[in-house]
């Protein structure tokens, strides 16, 4: 797997560091080998702890990278030719999903390893993060979390009422079929 750095204060952001949680968990799911979890569990916990340094009071994450000397987040700092020339999802929304994902995988790893206290800690964080995501990003009027995968993130996390879930699925279908021509 090599070394997966947090890349703090560089253009890479959270998405590279989350490999510390996703790679061991997905390896375990595919091969059933607990050793990968045993070898990486401490690092998985530290990655989530690092991510929580970016939490806002409402439980969602923020993007704190900016231009040198300017505390204002620079939303286009890490984008290259692979990004569309139109709108992209809010980084805070994507980072909040990543925190949920890493917390969820770490809680699952703790369960497999019999680490009950860690399982409870990371499950509680995942649940709080999921709830904060739904509260902040769901647009009740549109029945949507937004375009470009935002609805998929919400559906993966779950934890929403059935009626809301149906509206989100409807919005996602419309986005795929109408906005992006299928």
Residue ranges and their predicted role:
Residues 1-182:
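Active-site core of glycosidic bond-cleaving carbohydrate-active enzymes
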């Amino acid at each position: 797997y090599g070394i997966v750095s947090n890349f703090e204060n560089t253009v890479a952001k959270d998405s590279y560091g989350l490999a510390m949680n996703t790679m061991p968990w997905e390896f375990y799911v595919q091969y059933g080998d607990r050793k990968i979890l045993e070898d990486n569990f401490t690092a998985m916990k530290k990655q989530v702890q690092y991510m929580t340094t970016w939490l806002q009071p409402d439980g969602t994450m923020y993007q704190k990278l900016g231009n040198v000397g300017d505390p204002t987040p620079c939303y286009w700092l890490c984008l290259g030719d692979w990004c569309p020339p139109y709108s992209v999802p809010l980084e805070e929304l994507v980072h909040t999903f990543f925190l949920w994902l890493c917390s969820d995988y770490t809680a699952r790893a703790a369960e497999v390893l019999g680490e009950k206290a860690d399982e409870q800690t990371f499950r509680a964080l995942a649940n709080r993060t999921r709830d904060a995501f739904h509260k902040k990003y769901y647009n009740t009027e549109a029945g949507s979390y937004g375009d470009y995968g935002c609805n998929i993130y919400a559906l993966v996390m779950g934890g929403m009422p059935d009626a809301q879930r149906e509206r989100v699925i409807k919005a996602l279908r419309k986005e795929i079929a109408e906005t992006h021509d299928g």
